[in-house]
Amino acid sequence: MFYPDHFDVIIIGGGHAGTEAAMASARMGCQTLLLTHNIDTLGQMSCNPAIGGIGKGHLVKEIDAMGGLMAQAIDKGGIQFRILNASKGPAVRATRAQADRVLYRQAVRGALENQPNLMIFQQAVEDLIMEGDRVVGAVTQIGLKFRARAVVLTVGTFLDGKIHIGMDHYSGGRAGDPPSVSLSRRLRELPFRVNRLKTGTPPRIDAHSIDFSRLATQHGDDPLPVFSFLGSADQHPRQIPCYITYTNDKTHEVIRQNLDRSPMYAGIIEGVGPRYCPSIEDKVMRFADRDAHQIFLEPEGLTSNEIYPNGISTSLPFDVQMKIVHSMQGLENARIVRPGYAIEYDFFDPRDLKLTLESKLIEGLFFAGQINGTTGYEEAAAQGMLAGLNAARLAMGKDGWSPRRDQAYLGVLVDDLCTLGTKEPYRMFTSRAEYRLLLREDNADLRLTETGRQLGMVDDVRWERFCAKQEQIERERQRLRDIWVHPGSDGVEQLNPLLKASLTREANGEELLRRPEMDYARLTHLERFGPALVDSQAAEQVEIQIKYQGYIARQQEEIARQMRNEHTLLPAAMDFSTVSGLSNEVIAKLNDHKPNSIGQASRISGVTPAAISILLVWLKKQGLRHRSP
């Protein structure tokens, strides 16, 4: 044998799903092969130069909690960090980082190249090696055959990808890369349900041609947030601002006048696009009452002149793209350096997958990322990690693992995909999780790091840091419980000004911190209750666990209760539009199916667990919580 050709796990594709899958498998001790058509594009950001956001940041933290790569890479490549929803409760706060594409890609590649048990090889895959209903390897474009006990497909938008710019279209996996036509054809020969989806990207603009003096400036947060539980702000490169402009009546008129030249509106594109990241032509038509749409001008890196105009994804012809850009303030003389485009690609119905992301039809074959109908780097990376660890477990002869809905956003993601499927690119939101108070960014490690350790994903450094943090949290909570103060105590005159009402009875530190007007920093600034913890992560946990203790306990009770509501009856001939909080889509499905019980309602495609929770609350208020015999 002149070259290694037998592995435990093969990963096909080196994007965000593929890199996490490869790292997970290799960390668990499996000999892993990562096949990519171009080593230089490992971890490439094909669309927006950013990581995180509402729901997405939660996934990144969960990946990190289990030893994954994405959070550590963005800490090294992020050029602007912000906490979204900072003024709201901890459940919906989310970290977002603007990325330097080059630095991020370098961080990913560096981690991969230094990972034991992982071999990277540059070759496109054209076929799978099958033995009956089991996959046993892959064949590359020059006929090399590699065998493995498990294969993970993380091929993104490359399967029979077709790029559209106006009425022109050509084959491509993304701009500048070839599609994967042979592999797409081979997969279509297997017993999968296949369909087409669409996504898009905006034109890129030369920063030298923008009049920034006419734009609003958006800076990052101070102090600087970090993504990884092991990270620090010292790892971040130089931080720079983003800028804001707006579409206007002129922009919208240009779009309306050229809809006949849009491949989407002309019926040339058959794939369904992302509902929550629509093209600018879609936004103008769907929200005709809006006078303007906010556009964020995001730098693509510290050494790049390219600007990503977040909010004007389009497949309109290039001349129309120029008119759209020039219609906006500050961009009147802007130069486009890369045209925007839409891309259509194959995706495979995720209802054909187990919750481990292994195919129900082909043993040993796993799917992760956009091939499953999702959109976004974070959704892809989370699936990649799960598929990679389960491919490794299969190779080791062990049972698969997947998180529950009350355990992780990753659990929500795979349950939604594998149970309900999707007809449009699926994006994660906090609203998709019915137990979001438990599934916060800040406690992702407390939820998942111990599991990651048991699975073999978490190294000694992370584990020791995690155990020390847990110990600090419990020790500090006990310390606050043990410190009592009463109205006549020494130092109460320092405490009372911090309270809405002066102390009238004895209270300990935890009880004081539970008050809405008190926070951990102010409490521990008092000599009696100080000093504060130096570890900011542990200090944050102490405050959240104490302040939200009652709410968290109630949500844990709700989880147990939800399991008991399978046979709870719904009123006959019920009009679900009378239930406040249900989406129009859910109301339509419930009124159409007329379920007799909560159990039946929960199995209707599109009726989310969050909607079931709303129904249970409504039944309780109406005094209708009856169970069938």
From Swiss-Prot:
Keyword vocabulary terms for this entry: Cytoplasm, FAD, Flavoprotein, NAD, tRNA processing
Annotated FAD binding sites: 13-18, 125, 180, 370
Keyword Flavoprotein (UniProt): yes
Gene Ontology molecular-function annotations: flavin adenine dinucleotide binding
One Pfam match: SAM_GIDA_C
Name of the gene encoding the protein in the UniProt record: mnmG
SUPFAM superfamilies in UniProt: FAD/NAD(P)-binding domain (SSF51905)
GO cellular component labels: cytosol
Protein name: tRNA uridine 5-carboxymethylaminomethyl modification enzyme MnmG
Subcellular location, record wording: Cytoplasm
Domain of life: Bacteria
NCBIfam families referenced in this protein's UniProt entry, alphabetically: mnmG_gidA (TIGR00136)
Any one Gene Ontology BP term: tRNA wobble uridine modification
PANTHER family attached to this UniProt entry: GLUCOSE INHIBITED DIVISION PROTEIN A, PROTEIN MTO1 HOMOLOG, MITOCHONDRIAL
Quaternary structure note: Homodimer. Heterotetramer of two MnmE and two MnmG subunits.
Annotated NAD(+) binding sites: 273-287
Stated family: Belongs to the MnmG family.
Cofactor(s) required, per the database record: FAD
